[in-house]
Amino acid sequence: MTDVADVNVGIIRFPGTNCDRDIEYAVNLVGANSHYIYWNETDLSQMDVVIIPGGFSYGDYLRAGSIAGITPIIDAIKDFAKKENPVLGICNGAQILGEIDLVPGVFIENENAKFICKSKKLKVNTTRTPFTKLYKKNEVIDLPIAHKEGRYYTDNLETLYDNNQIVLTFEDGNPNGSLDNITGVCNVDGNVVAVMPHPERAVEKLLRSEDGLKFFKSFLD
């Protein structure tokens, strides 16, 4: 078990990020240290984990995550991931990870072209990532979603199954038209995870569900 007091989590902030404080709360709740890292910084050497929050980086102009994907911090995130360090992108963070090719596929506009905000039942398809290893395989969890561009698509679906890269799928109906109900994927190595649902909004029973807490406890295990 890692000494949580020694774990430093970098929370990336872009103009338009708005879920950073929720993630800070979740990280601190499990006892790790949270640090805000801004879009124009280039050093992640003191971090053990990087989390890219949700929000609307740069107003989601052009395409969700596209402008954030060319900022100075991106090369540092790529280098961090290349060393097999844990990287988690949530909602807009997941879109950014798709934009910079750290995970396969893309998250595009919902089939109904509307913003969807609701709680969903999700299946944990793999426990091999740093963020899901405390769950049971095929465990069903309750997490909120809140997005307009959350429909997952890839040309390489068979490869995802072959490599065990599907992290989360919708279990109680597909709200946005995602391919094969997919709402979370990882890279081949499993250290980079992109999920559209918000685990940081489900860390206490007061918030309806605490099913997201293991996302943050897992990287400490």
Curated annotation (Swiss-Prot):
Pathway: Purine metabolism; IMP biosynthesis via de novo pathway; 5-amino-1-(5-phospho-D-ribosyl)imidazole from N(2)-formyl-N(1)-(5-phospho-D-ribosyl)glycinamide: step 1/2. Transmembrane segments: none annotated. GO terms for biological process: 'de novo' IMP biosynthetic process. The active site is at residues 91, 198, 200. PROSITE patterns: GATASE_TYPE_1. The keyword Oxidoreductase does not apply. It catalyses: N(2)-formyl-N(1)-(5-phospho-beta-D-ribosyl)glycinamide + L-glutamine + ATP + H2O = 2-formamido-N(1)-(5-O-phospho-beta-D-ribosyl)acetamidine + L-glutamate + ADP + phosphate + H(+); L-glutamine + H2O = L-glutamate + NH4(+). Residues 8-221 form the Glutamine amidotransferase type-1 domain. It comes from the Archaea. Gene3D superfamilies: 3.40.50.880. Its main location: cytoplasm. It holds the Pfam family GATase_5. It is found in: Cytoplasm. HAMAP family: PurQ. This is Phosphoribosylformylglycinamidine synthase subunit PurQ. It comes from Methanosphaera stadtmanae (strain ATCC 43021 / DSM 3091 / JCM 11832 / MCB-3). The gene is purQ.
